[in-house]
Amino acid sequence: MITLYLARHGETEQNLAHIFQGQMPGRLTALGRQQAADLGERLKAIPFDSLLSSDLTRAYDTVEIAFGDRHLPHYTTPLLREIDWGSWTGLAITPERSLAMRPADAESDAQLYERAARFITYLKQHFEGQTVLAVGHGMINRRVIAQIEGLPLERVKEIPLFTNCEYRRLTL
């Protein structure tokens, strides 16, 4: 069994600018850094064995700010990266380019859902019996939850969105 605390990164400059951040590194704002510190405070009593994050800067920095003083192993994986928005990466979110749409060169919902399944396989192979914190991103996190709960892709939208530095406790 794995006890997974799945969280989203802190607020970034790109979140504030309302752009398609996707797989850009991202830079935490002052508020995002405070959110990360608060996450560490909220979870200070949890005896984590390992810390995980996507390999994108905003997720990595969130873990380091929240838990860097614990001196636990911090692993990164591209499996937890946010959706790849393709040619929309770095562009403003507008009515003509909304989060509900995708350009032809973006990662599809099915591809993102499959990547979430690969992340769960990775967890089971490397972290069995552990309590793990994993910091990812809004869209991938919802698909990870769907995979753990056995929900089909069509039902992912039923899973509430993550706010910055929100976490959810899951067991697998």
Predicted feature descriptions by range:
Residues 12, 140-141:
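Short active-site segment of divalent metal-dependent hydrolases/proteases
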